[in-house]
Amino acid sequence: MPARPRGAGRPRVGPAPCRGAFLLIAFFLAVCLGPGGAERATAAEAAQPATDALQPLITTSELVVGQNRFAFGLLRQGRLLADATVAVRVYDVRGEVPLLTAARPAVYHRLEVIEEGQHVHMHPDGTRHLHGPASDAHGIYVAHLPFDRPGPWGIEILARQGDGPVETARLRVTALGAPRAPLPGTPAPRSRNLVAGDVADLSAIDSSEPPDPRLHQTRIADAIAQGRPQVIVFATPRYCASRVCGPVVDVVRTLIPTYGSRVAFIHQEIWQGPPGQAFAPTVQEWNLPSEPWIFLVDERGLIRARFEGLTTRRELEAAVRSMLGLP
């Protein structure tokens, strides 16, 4: 993730397999609820420093009061951990003893644009091209966490791979009372983003290799005026620096053949000109605290869903189908 220009602070940035659904449920009950249920679940453990080597790589920089998509990778001994059974605990840390307020499973979503360690790049004509080696980020863990007030919270992540021991990682986060980026249910900014017809060279507004003209045909404001749903991806493909940034533009591209006749797919670069110098006007209008982001905007111009950081086709397609009223 590139650094913000001077004066603009930037935050840091299918079900997991086991030996059956019963073991997954048993693990969740054991590590999330503890022997005494949600009210008593070893809240004191959250006050102890983590002593193991499990390191979370959080891709969600903005948490707000309400429900949140909390996405993260897990690093162990220098490698990203895939397909583990994972749960997340949320603690109120305002008192001397942290109080457990919620416990949720985290589902591992495998990236559909990674095959055998190589990055699958979708060209505008529909052909597939393998680039290698890909990042070792082949998927992402997602938990949906509730925060009922603004301020500090404690997060405990518990992970178990196969029959191995339960490993933990702990961190503190802050829930905002008011979001910076637009929330679902609010009107989308009526941005007049640059499109292909505005530039002599498409690479001026798309750092993908090669640039994809399908993602630069429609202005956000025009789609709203026409009552056309949108999938808008804010990303800088060439300069994705974070280990878990992921090929989000390629994930979006995979949906165009199926939904392109009903949905406007739009890509907006983060920077106007050289990276790190100035944000594009559309990015400033959307007040994004990080990148990448994907927003779904319905035919009324309301935001239906938002995804920060690494996102999989399965998550995105489910949201698109819901927006279109499809089963």
Residue ranges and their predicted role:
Residues 181, 304, 308-327:
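Thiol-/selenol-based redox modules, centered on thioredoxin-like
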Residues 1-18:
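N-terminal secretory signal peptides that target proteins for export/translocation
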Residues 242-259:
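Typically the conserved alpha-helix immediately C-terminal to a functionally engaged Cys/Sec
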Residues 44-205:
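Contiguous segments within soluble domain cores/interaction surfaces
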